[in-house]
Amino acid sequence: MADTKEMKAVLFGPVLANNPIALQVLGICSALAVTSSLKNALIMSIALTLVTAFSSFFISTIRNQIPSSVRIIVQMTIIASLVIVVDQVLQAFSYATAKELSVFIGLIITNCIVMGRAEAYAMKSPPLMSFLDGIGNGLGYSVVLLTVGFIRELFGKGSLFGVDIIPLVQNGGWYQPMGLLILPPSAFFIIGLFIWVLRTYKKDQVEAKA
């Protein structure tokens, strides 16, 4: 049984110290696609966190019964089943959002973070630790997504969660929204800035020069 210190390291390590996007550069595609609004970023973050946590838990539970030759197929089957559940729940409670995010929710099946944690950690670790690892990596993913979504919606539209925060010029206010931030490439710049700030304070994450 893992001790409390190890559990905390597994749970909180991926948030900043070993962030899946900032350090491992995984899950970039969805970070570009769904962060034009904070609402979409939040829903995607919750969906990926739940799928990563529970898929890692279930895969770890049966890891000793999975033949090595078909382990990837088994992992993807479990992940796909959980993604279908998430998509159906989203359609039941927020159909408009589900319709908008349907393609990206479906792509969680092949998300590098989910597949990576299943193969690299869940196949070698007990269920509880695998579940915590999934939660931790989901939180690390969420931190970046929510940061990008916050900046893009606030300065690109002058709103948060669809509610006007900054008075726009077209509505008689003073702020001229930055249209560039609504475009997907802006997420690249913001993620790059996030990585730069993180590595400024965490020198151990800077790659060694050849």
From Swiss-Prot:
Q: Which residues form the signal peptide?
A: none
In the record, what terms sit under GO molecular function? oxidoreductase activity, acting on NAD(P)H, quinone or similar compound as acceptor
Task: Describe the protein's quaternary organization and the partners it interacts with.
Answer: Composed of six subunits; NqrA, NqrB, NqrC, NqrD, NqrE and NqrF.
Organism per entry: Pseudoalteromonas translucida (strain TAC 125)
Catalysed reactions, semicolon-separated: a ubiquinone + n Na(+)(in) + NADH + H(+) = a ubiquinol + n Na(+)(out) + NAD(+)
- Give the enzyme class: translocase
Q: Name one Pfam family in it.
A: Rnf-Nqr
Which EC numbers characterise this protein's activity in its record?
7.2.1.1
Q: What is this protein called?
A: Na(+)-translocating NADH-quinone reductase subunit D
The entry assigns this protein to a family as follows: Belongs to the NqrDE/RnfAE family.
Q: Biological process GO terms, please?
A: sodium ion transport
Question: Where does the chain cross the membrane?
Answer: 9-29, 42-62, 72-92, 96-116, 131-151, 178-198
The annotated topology with respect to the bilayer is: Multi-pass membrane protein
| GO CC aspect terms | plasma membrane
Q: What does this protein do?
A: NQR complex catalyzes the reduction of ubiquinone-1 to ubiquinol by two successive reactions, coupled with the transport of Na(+) ions from the cytoplasm to the periplasm. NqrA to NqrE are probably involved in the second step, the conversion of ubisemiquinone to ubiquinol.
- Highest taxon of the lineage: Bacteria
Alphabetically sorted, this entry's keywords are: Cell inner membrane, Cell membrane, Ion transport, Membrane, NAD, Sodium, Sodium transport, Translocase, Transmembrane, Transmembrane helix, Transport, Ubiquinone
Subcellular location(s) of the protein = Cell inner membrane
